[in-house]
Amino acid sequence: MDAVKKAILGEVLEEEEAYEVMRALMAGEVSPVRAAGLLVALSLRGERPHEIAAMARAMREAARPLRVHRRPLLDIVGTGGDGKGLMNLSTLAALVAAAGGVAVAKHGNRAASSRAGSADLLEALGVDLEAPPERVGEAIEELGFGFLFARVFHPAMRHVAPVRAELGVRTVFNLLGPLTNPAGADAYVLGVFSPEWLAPMAEALERLGARGLVVHGEGADELVLGENRVVEVGKGAYALTPEEVGLKRAPLEALKGGGPEENAALARRLLKGEEKGPLADAVALAAGAGFYAAGKTPSLKEGVALAREVLASGEAYLLLERYVAFLRA
């Protein structure tokens, strides 16, 4: 029996079958009807970590290649789809982490649930989203930061985009987005839209040879200034509160974003170190987790302290300006 049919019948796929199914989807070899049946069946049954990892491998292989030599290579990324409409914290945290000396390949797309995804925000900040992949790779090598726009790096997604759009429900691709970094990031802070995905996504990361933290905070795919749940790859689960890392508690409301232009103005103030308060603290928390995940600091608390120093220095804004200019050169 073929693997697509097997999945539609609700059976768990072997690793090789999951890989083969995704390879076929990326090659446009699966009809829209069968593709829809497959995606819905997987979602209803619940994707297994070995299936997710195998599919991520196939998607990475179908992506436009980007060879980056710097290691560790960090990505701070979320699944999206949490419906919370928060400010794009992961994007700003990625710039802070890079300004603090960790090489970052930030993989992202346009908005999933907020009014502004990472691509929307960076575009409003002057970043050329359509820059050639090799130029983005050079930026990571030279500046320590690059934005990998999913639409540019994953052209094979055109085969499944209409099916996903028409279904309008969560599919395995919501989980695969963060795992398919074309530069092959090996350190992650990965936010998930629901706590049930913490352990499976951590296992998928481990199977892909990556380290890091899978996080969920009060219904959001981000670390928030309240109750967070974390699964550290290969190390287990724990709760995390802002007080433990020297930050003040704040409600989710305080982390809400607006449209791209509004967010861009706020982002500039944050990156220049001019914005104090909950948003700056939330960015420091995510960037601090990034420093810890990449092995830059021995603890999350020290990571947050370093992130606050970097934010206050305005270095992250200077890096953004250099990156914008580098892509235009």
From Swiss-Prot:
Pfam families: Glycos_trans_3N, Glycos_transf_3. It catalyses: N-(5-phospho-beta-D-ribosyl)anthranilate + diphosphate = 5-phospho-alpha-D-ribose 1-diphosphate + anthranilate. Its EC number is 2.4.2.18. Mg(2+) 1 binds at S90, E222. Binds 2 magnesium ions per monomer. InterPro entries: Anthranilate_Pribosyl_Tfrase, Glycosyl_Trfase_fam3, Glycosyl_Trfase_fam3_N_dom, Glycosyl_Trfase_fam3_N_dom_sf, Nuc_phospho_transferase. GO terms for molecular function: anthranilate phosphoribosyltransferase activity; magnesium ion binding. GO terms for biological process: L-tryptophan biosynthetic process. Mg(2+) 2 binds at D221, E222. 5-phospho-alpha-D-ribose 1-diphosphate binds at residues 78, 81-82, 88-91, 106-114, 118. Pathway: Amino-acid biosynthesis; L-tryptophan biosynthesis; L-tryptophan from chorismate: step 2/5. It comes from the Bacteria. Its cofactor is Mg(2+). Anthranilate 2 binds at R164. Anthranilate 1 binds at G78, N109. GO terms for cellular component: cytosol. Keywords: Amino-acid biosynthesis, Aromatic amino acid biosynthesis, Glycosyltransferase, Magnesium, Metal-binding, Transferase, Tryptophan biosynthesis. Homodimer. NCBIfam families: trpD. Catalyzes the transfer of the phosphoribosyl group of 5-phosphorylribose-1-pyrophosphate (PRPP) to anthranilate to yield N-(5'-phosphoribosyl)-anthranilate (PRA). Belongs to the anthranilate phosphoribosyltransferase family. This is Anthranilate phosphoribosyltransferase. It comes from Thermus thermophilus (strain ATCC 27634 / DSM 579 / HB8).
